[in-house]
A protein has these predicted regions:
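AAA+ P-loop NTPase catalytic core and its hallmark functional loops
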Residues: 2-153
């Protein structure tokens, strides 16, 4: 079944937060954030402890629109770290599990048949990548090493 993502492109970060105060690490600079969360913002885990170097790398991605790769052993908390940074910034975050059967069509989009006024109509339904380009979103590509080459080429 196709997933429909709602657009919120009129939103952009509208506040700045002090990194030291927000993440409890020794850093004195500000990072853009959203005043209010939306449906794509992860829940805050108030017990989460941030690793300084990893947090600073992730924050560089949020503040400077950079791509960040976090690597580590399976189950070491890479995706959770990104989600917890996003949660404190009220920044939308979507996790894509690449070890599942995700296809090029899921990533880029496809024609879908819908009903309009009791008639079948074919409409293009965007995939997650075009949607994310149009909306301020952190995409987390989980299990990247297990991704199928025909899907990874589009990322």
């Amino acid at each position: 079944m196709a997933t429909t993502y709602s657009n919120f492109s009129e939103n952009s970060p509208d506040i700045v937060l002090n990194v030291g105060n927000t993440f409890g690490i020794d850093a004195d600079f500000e990072v853009p954030a959203f005043a209010e969360p939306n449906e794509y913002v992860p829940e805050i885990d108030s017990t989460y402890c941030f690793d300084k170097n990893t947090t600073l790398a992730i924050l560089a991605g949020f503040s400077d629109n950079r791509r960040v790769m976090v690597q580590g052993l399976h189950g070491s908390g890479k995706s959770t770290h990104i989600e917890q940074v996003a949660a404190r910034l009220n920044w939308p975050c979507v996790r894509i599990n690449l070890d599942s059967h995700i296809s090029r069509l899921d990533l880029l989009g496809k024609d879908a048949i819908t009903l309009e006024k009791d008639k079948q109509v074919t409409k293009f339904q965007e995939g997650i990548l075009p949607w994310a380009i149009q909306n301020p979103t952190a995409l987390v590509f989980d299990e990247y090493d297990a991704g199928r080459p025909l899907s990874l080429i589009h990322i």
